[in-house]
Design a protein with these regions (language model features):
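Short, solvent-exposed loop/linker segments at the N-terminal edge
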Residues: 34-44, 132-143, 234-244, 333-343, ...
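Aromatic/hydrophobic beta-strand junction motif of beta-rich domains
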Residues: 46-52, 145-151, 246-252, 345-351, ...
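Flexible, low-complexity linkers/stalks enriched in Thr/Pro that connect modular domains
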Residues: 3, 10-32, 109-127, 212-232, ...
Length: 538
């Protein structure tokens, strides 16, 4: 400033800044979840960060078109933050940011953002084409099964399947097909066992949903543990029976739900029934023919796996009736009368089939019985007592059992063991004179022999001549008679009697007798002392 006097004076310098504008450098949705910087969040209380020049001294925000404003807070030079204090509704929103600097300049910027908190819960199911057992039982015999994923929202960006098998866990990616449907198929074959699958879906907003776990069992095989012919008779386990209606028992794993059987080469099938113990049984309702048969068994488990096994078996209902006879060499009496004088007689057993596995003889004697098992020797069946039998009657019955369990009995054979006989009495029937003195005046003596009733032959011989004559059985049992047909000479004689019984036993006895046919003619005279007249005149 200069006055009239010419004085000049200077003020202190004044620096003035002309600032006619400000700016908003950036607006950031801090809790942008999911894909970064897509301004999509699942946070219902979004957090914003505004970057502005350092001279900005006020930042405010509005999401209702400027009707309502909230003030951001400066957190560092040029950085302002605000977290919404109340829930922001789902959907698209426009954020308006207004910044004011110290010069009073203002600027506004907008940012579109979306709040998305919804995501459907995914579903996973075994593909029906691979659900090989009962539909919906989550059991499959496919070792690389396909799973269908449903309820997958269109904004899903990650779809994975977690597979837990034993202690092994892996996370695998699902695949979206050309038709838009999601599915999952393992890259390699799964071993048999249980698998638990859980689907995890993440959308663009970062929402995550998991399906309920699905437990699936992979079962690619089954088995038939055993087939048993229940009415296997005879030798156990040889699959030989005499039952025309065989009964079978099939043992399988517990998950088998169908067992069927066939006897005609798989043309016709019948279904077995599972008992309370988990074993499958079937009794053939009609007669099955004699001979060899092949049983085919097919088992199907819950996963649809099948197993087949066969059993060869034979039905044998035939067995010959055995025959027992006394050995002819020991049939010592009349042939075929089964009476023997042998105390350890031999018996021949015939009509024994080749498949006989047990042959026994039951011997009944005097109210008791015992059984002896026989062994075939030299192709023959034979029985001889191991100790001498006492005299008496014995009944022998042969029992034969074959490999199929058939049993046949012989007709009982009654045998009598008789090892001795006797001559009870020899009588000279025409014993004249003094009784029983065996003195007769008959030139043709008559004899009576008393013997046991089983004696079949009585013969007589005189004086050791070696000539024998046969007596004749009398009307009374045990009495035999013989009258000599020709004259026997005077004097002493010895009669020899030999008897033979039905068993062939013999006994001999002798009788001494005498024939006396002579007697002098007697003479009588008067004693001479008393002959008083002429001597000799009587």
């Amino acid at each position: 400033v200069e006055d009239k006097a010419g004085n000049v004076s200077h003020s202190a310098p004044l620096t003035v800044t002309v600032d006619t504008q400000t700016a908003i450098n950036s607006i950031e949705l801090v809790n942008d979840t999911g894909i970064p910087d897509d301004n999509l969040t699942n946070a219902v209380r979004p957090h914003f960060r505004v970057t502005v020049p350092d001279d900005v001294n006020a930042v405010r925000l509005s999401i209702d078109g400027g009707k309502t404003w909230v003030d951001a807070k400066r957190t560092s030079a040029g950085v302002w933050d605000y977290s919404w204090l109340t829930d922001v509704t789902e959907g698209a929103h426009t954020l308006t940011v207004e910044a004011t600097d110290v010069a009073g300049n203002t600027v506004k910027e907008t940012m579109s953002f979306t709040v998305d908190t919804t995501l459907s819960v995914p579903l996973i199911a075994l593909d029906s084409a691979d659900d090989s057992g009962v539909r919906g039982d989550e059991l499959t015999r496919v070792n690389r099964p396909t799973f269908l994923l449903d309820n997958i929202d269109n904004d899903a960006r990650h779809v994975t399947v977690e597979v837990q098998h034993g202690s092994t866990r892996e996370v695998l990616k699902a695949t979206q097909g050309a038709n838009g449907r999601w599915s999952f198929t393992p890259a390699g074959d799964w071993a048999d066992g249980q698998y638990t699958l859980t689907v995890k879906v993440e959308d663009e907003a970062g929402n995550i949903r998991q399906s309920a776990p699905l437990t699936v069992t992979v079962d690619t095989q089954t088995a038939i543990d055993g087939i048993e012919l229940v009415n296997d008779h005879g030798i156990s386990g040889d699959n030989l029976t005499n039952a025309l209606r065989p009964e079978f028992r099939v043992t399988t794993p517990g998950d088998v739900n169908t067992v069927r059987l066939s006897l005609d080469g798989d043309t016709n099938w019948v279904n077995a029934t599972k008992n309370a113990a988990g074993v499958w049984e079937y009794n053939w309702p009609g007669d099955v023919g004699e001979g060899k048969h092949t049983l085919t068994v097919e088992a199907t488990d819950a996963a649809g796996n099948t197993a087949t096994r066969t059993l060869e078996f034979t039905i044998d209902t035939t067995l010959s009736v055995p025959v027992i006879t006394l050995d002819s060499a020991d049939d010592s009496g009349n042939r075929g009368d089964n009476v023997t004088s042998v105390r350890s007689p031999g018996f021949t057993i015939e009509n024994i089939d080749p498949d006989a596995n047990r042959v026994t003889v039951q011997i009944a004697h005097d109210g008791s019985s015992r059984e002896v098992e026989l062994t075939q020797t030299g192709g023959r069946w034979h029985f001889t007592p191991d100790s001498a039998w006492t005299d008496g009657s014995y009944t022998l019955t042969v029992k034969v059992e074959d490999n199929a369990g058939n049993i046949r009995y012989s007709t009982p054979l009654d045998v009598k063991v008789d090892t001795h006989t006797s001559i009870n009495h020899i009588e000279l029937v025409n014993d004249n004179g003094v009784p029983d003195d065996n003195l007769t005046n008959e030139m043709r003596p008559q004899f009576r022999v008393t013997v046991p009733e089983d004696v079949t032959v009585v013969r007589l011989s005189l004086d050791g001549s070696g000539d024998w004559v046969n007596a004749t059985a009398g009307a009374t049992k045990g009495e035999w008679n013989y009258s000599w047909p020709s004259d026997v000479g005077e004097g002493k004689h010895v009669l020899t009697v030999e008897v033979t019984d039905a068993a062939g036993n013999t006994a001999t006895k002798a009788l001494d007798f005498r024939i006396d046919t002579r007697l002098s003619e007697p003479v009588i005279t008067l004693n001479s002392a008393d002959d008083t007249g002429v001597p000799g005149d009587g």
